[in-house]
């Protein structure tokens, strides 16, 4: 059947993807709202996507599902975590859910159908394409894309996320990293004082 003037088919939902809503990955097209991690359902972008057997994942879920397993493997502060992804629903024989809920926080039916603006994760105001940054799978204004503790400007590659908030690596390690003897402030941390 000819595709008269229509776009490519979405790799997730199978419907037609028109140019204005298209995201391309690994030779396939997706609607922006369908370009989600197969496990945790977070929005993806070119810096957060990982592909395995034609399925798309965020880097975190990909690492948990296909990365090295065992004691001591992790990502940054708190790496001695034995979480194997059970809380995210990762099981050896898991199958993806056929229902794909929308991730657009805008509850207006018109906005969901016709691409209403997403809401900034920090201030809650509308985020438009010209000022939008994706970090931790969520939209932010460029000016709101800062560490929650120190206010330092972040990039998608220099942030860490905890409970929906973003931090620079230094503040994350200081506030959520391992505590106790041997975890210190650099070269002088284990100095014996008399």
From Swiss-Prot:
Keyword Zinc in record: yes
Domain LIM zinc-binding: 10-61, 120-171
Membrane spanning residue stretches: none
Subcellular location: Nucleus
Cellular component terms (Gene Ontology): nucleus
Pfam families in the cross-refs: LIM
Sorted UniProt keywords: Developmental protein, Differentiation, LIM domain, Metal-binding, Nucleus, Repeat, Zinc
Name used for this protein in its record: Cysteine and glycine-rich protein 2
């Amino acid at each position: 059947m000819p595709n008269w003037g229509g776009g490519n088919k979405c790799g997730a939902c199978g419907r037609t993807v028109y140019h204005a809503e298209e995201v391309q990955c690994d030779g396939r097209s997706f609607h922006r709202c369908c370009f989600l991690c197969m496990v945790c359902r977070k929005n993806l972008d070119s810096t957060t996507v990982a592909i395995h057997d034609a399925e798309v994942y965020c880097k975190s879920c990909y690492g948990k599902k296909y990365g090295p397993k065992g004691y001591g493997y992790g990502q940054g502060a708190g790496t001695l975590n034995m979480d194997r992804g059970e809380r995210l629903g990762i099981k050896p024989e898991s199958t993806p859910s056929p229902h794909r809920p929308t991730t657009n926080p805008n509850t207006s039916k018109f906005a969901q159908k016709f691409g209403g603006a997403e809401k900034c994760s920090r201030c809650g105001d509308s985020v438009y394409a010209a000022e939008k940054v994706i970090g931790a799978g969520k939209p932010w204004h460029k000016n709101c894309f800062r560490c929650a503790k120190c206010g330092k400007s972040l990039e998608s590659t220099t942030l860490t996320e905890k409970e929906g908030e973003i931090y620079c690596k230094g503040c994350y390690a200081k506030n959520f990293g391992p505590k106790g003897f041997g975890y210190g402030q650099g070269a002088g941390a284990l100095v014996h004082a008399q």
